[in-house]
Amino acid sequence: MSKQTFTTTFAGKPLVVEVGQVAKQANGATVVRYGDSTVLTAAVMSKKMATGDFFPLQVNYEEKMYAAGKFPGGFMKREGRPSTDATLTARLIDRPIRPMFAEGFRNEVQVINTVLSYDENASAPMAAMFGSSLALSISDIPFNGPIAGVQVGYIDGEFIINPDKEQMEASLLELTVAGSKEAINMVESGAKELSEDIMLEALLKGHQAIQELIAFQEQIVAVVGKEKAEVELLQVDADLQADIVAKYNAQLQKAVQVEEKKAREAATEAVKEMVKAEYEERYAEDENLATIMRDVAEILEQMEHAEVRRLITEDKIRPDGRKIDEIRPLDAVVDFLPKVHGSGLFTRGQTQALSILTLAPMGETQIIDGLAPEYKKRFLHHYNFPQYSVGETGRYGAAGRREIGHGALGERALEQVLPSLEEFPYAIRLVAEVLESNGSSSQASICAGTLALMAGGVPIKAPVAGIAMGLISDGTNYTVLTDIQGLEDHFGDMDFKVAGTREGITALQMDIKIAGITPQILEEALAQAKKARFEILDVIEATIAEPRPELAPTAPKIDTIKIDVDKIKVVIGKGGETIDKIIAETGVKIDIDDEGNVSIYSSDQAAINRTKEIIAGLVREAKVGEVYHAKVVRIEKFGAFVNLFDKTDALVHISEIAWTRTTNVSDVLEVGEDVDVKVIKIDEKGRVDASMKALIPRPPKPEKKEEKHD
């Protein structure tokens, strides 16, 4: 296929798609140019069904530093593991694409997005999402798209689609919404305490804008789209399914209704093991035993799936016996740990998170050097999910995509209520350790983070709580669930996380397993989430009503002084010599910004005070008319040099020593002698002249003797 180009304009920027020129061996490939951002997307599919009980979809978003005219950092000067932003963008693209493949599709699919050029005012992630959908849609991969996504901002009561950098900085909302022509299927958002009504309107505005992008994709697919390949879907043997359902459905139904998680898991596992043992023995000699046992496992999973959903939609019974809008038992604790700067333990049913606060000087902020211009990140929220939290063994290592994503969600939720840098000049790190999990651990980490911040004396604007909403839908009827647990998340259709204060929403995240959800479902879920959020805030505020007025004794204290910008180099010294000497003497940490704000950190107030004295002395300037108690440091024929303070000397000319004539300076002064002097002149080069005699009353002139006349 020869190169074909398609052009339109979206949100005020040119959107150009090129097909047929590059990556022609992939099943589908596109080059998307949005503004001056260029993204190459290639989609490929394995020829055979993969083994395993899940759909092996891999979406990558690769930031090439040359796209922004930069060298990669590090010794190797080569791109390494994906940045946090790249990982989050890959997840952002994966989530709306995944539900658009048929149930039972098991061929491996890879979608690789490579950023070739970067324009900070034209969203490369949105171009990559568009390119991912289009590459799949024009390929022979059986993708039931297209989908598209947009960013939505909110400025002065107006919604902005795909805002540029300046607009996003002024926006009260940073929303990414994706979906198909019919419905929304992915949401990711941070917001400055916006109401449910505004958030819902933003979602609908975003979905409306998506239609234009989907229509453009459909136009391209009509011209260059390939016929979809026939692939084998994972389907179980119908006779085998009927046999197992008839024999064991009642036992599995009973096991599913055990309320306590561990007991329920043990009961369902016992039924499954009994079934597997029977059919493994029955078909032990069959050459297709592996396929039969795979089908048995899939049938049992489908039976459990169907029963959980039936109980909720028909009987309105949840696995743990709760009402549809009921939250699990809550508990909130502060000061769980000694020595740390703040800690909070939050428990919701069998989900528990411990959050630990650490405060540090601003010099500890994280430097982010990606495609965008380098910047410093003051607030970090890290989320850890050890396998023991679900009573299992498993790998331990660096944070995976899920942990990075959950940490970022908590960061967005809590960042909106943090004090400004001027109010609270600290770098802030929260670490959420998930100690138990039965669903919604990311929201528990937000609640625990609020407790830790307030216990640590961080003056947040308001406490934040989070809740996860679920959905069970059969296409006609649906049930929205409050505070979903693991089983409801696993077998449900939606995981809709909502975090916020009493004033409004600070973060949203939605993932679904069906093609999309309607505005009515969104509205109902937001309303239920608000009610639940307020219940959780009641518990948090009963534990700690407001941030403590003082920091923990172990937290670094801070004092700030202002110096002239041209004095920064004096405090730092050549090669950092002066500031290093101050730090070595006092044991403090010092940060100096470009505007001359000097922040001094230490747990010892005396050390802070001593540091302030030293710096004040370094930047002190002599002023004409001021009097100083000085020390003679050098004597010359023409006068004496005296030290006024620190490194500031002045010349007392021989004529300024006394009102009477001084013949030899050394007859009057000696090195080391203390004298009081007054500054009388500072020239354009900063040289200081001082006077001793200016502090001495001038003696009266002697009266002239009258001449006698004869």
Curated annotation (Swiss-Prot):
Residues 691-710 are annotated as: Disordered. Its cofactor is Mg(2+). Residues 556-615 form the KH domain. Its EC number is 2.7.7.8. Coiled coil: none annotated. Residues 625-693 form the S1 motif domain. This is Polyribonucleotide nucleotidyltransferase. It comes from Streptococcus pyogenes serotype M12 (strain MGAS9429). The gene is pnp.
